[in-house]
Design a protein with these regions (language model features):
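Short, exposed beta-strand "edge-strand" segments with a Pro/Gly-rich flavor and a Y/T-containing core
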Residues: 61-63, 222-223
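Conserved ATP-binding subdomain of kinase catalytic cores across diverse folds
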Residues: 1-19, 28-55, 62-68, 73-186, ...
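Acidic catalytic cores of enzymes that act on phosphate-bearing nucleotides/polynucleotides
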Residues: 187-261, 271
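Short secondary-structure boundary segments
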Residues: 11-22, 105, 215, 219-228
Length: 328
């Protein structure tokens, strides 16, 4: 089959529209090989299933495990445990849309490919930028990417060994980074944006997304990010999701143009907190934002539907179950 027809079929299978419709997701994917890779996880699994990507069979003799499914450099980041009122900042996978029970080599392969694509993506951004500061920043070399890929595999094996020894478990996490580490500055920024941090009221997710000048607390009016919801529909959504959150839903908006792979999926932001709350730091940290998103089948399962009975859970439950195992 002509390659473009395979791509077309896989995009239509997942997104339920052809590229000719020019949805935002496909436009974003067309702008960069890295973005295309991020938005086409199902295509990779199709290529694995038909043998176009040749993975050594010996790797399939290893036990199945929880996998991210769409494991790439863009799906890791800093998150505070327990939302805004958590006091632990961890570095971990942060997107589980395609998580399921699967073969660990799929995550390792996908992440390794993403290292090379992200390096090229950043190189292209730098070469085509008019920003002198950006053009002068050091760029990761291909040799460094080679070293990073090998280090990633080594650390995975090391983590497996520690798990067997009992020194690594689902309560373990990356929580600190020394000054020489590439993530140190971002870790410090994350700490400042947490509740109690110097930048909590200016740079935290709550501060960026909420209108802190008005009472009661509400999401900002921002046509680029949020779509207001008709009052009756908003009331229905808040009533429907109230049993699943740990406090009162104070407001609800539809989030626009977020993500890449799931860019075309409807999603909502819920503001959750005490019924009576104001915008000062002592009370704002009692609130948090919950993302509610339409969930679809994990990408590996289109081509590998019989890996595990656990994968027969509905898509939302499977995602949550895997996230519990993978995010710590």
């Amino acid at each position: 089959m002509i390659r473009k027809n395979t791509i077309r079929e896989q995009l239509q299978l997942v997104d339920e529209v052809t590229p000719e419709h020019s949805i935002n997701k496909h436009i974003k994917m067309a702008s960069s090989p890295f973005f295309f890779f991020r938005g086409s996880a199902a295509l990779m699994y199709q290529d694995i299933a038909c043998g176009l990507i040749d993975i050594p069979q010996a790797l399939y003799t290893l036990p199945l495990t929880n996998i991210v499914g769409d494991c790439h450099t863009g799906n890791f980041g800093f998150i505070s445990e327990e939302g805004s009122h958590g006091d632990t900042l961890i570095f971990a996978p942060n997107d589980f849309d395609d998580a399921c029970i699967g073969n660990m080599i799929w995550d390792l392969f996908r992440f390794t490919v993403s290292l090379y694509l992200s390096q090229k993506h950043c190189q292209n951004l730098q070469e085509n930028s008019d920003d002198l500061k950006l053009r002068q920043k050091p760029l990761v070399t291909e040799q460094q990417v080679d070293s990073a890929a090998l280090a990633f595999f080594d650390q995975y094996l090391h983590a497996c060994a520690r798990s067997i020894e009992g020194t690594l478990n689902n309560q373990s996490a990356l929580t600190e980074f020394d000054k020489e580490h590439i993530l140190h500055k971002r870790w410090q920024k994350g700490l400042q944006r947490m509740a109690g941090g110097a930048a909590f009221l200016t740079s935290s997710t709550l501060a960026k997304e909420l209108d802190l000048t008005k009472a009661p607390l509400r999401f900002k009016t921002n046509p680029q990010r949020f779509e207001p919801i008709p009052e009756q529909h908003k009331s229905d959504l808040m009533k429907h999701f109230s049993p699943y959150v740990d406090n009162t839903i104070l407001d609800c908006v539809e989030r626009l143009n977020a993500g890449t792979g799931s860019n075309n999926m409807r999603r909502y932001y819920l503001l959750v907190g005490p019924k009576q709350v104001n915008s000062d730091a002592s009370q704002l940290n009692l609130c948090h934002i919950v993302e509610v998103k339409q969930q679809r089948r994990a990408a590996p399962l289109h081509n590998f539907p019989s890996l595990s009975p656990i994968n027969e859970l509905n898509a939302a439950h499977l995602t949550v179950n895997c996230q519990r195992k993978l995010s710590t």
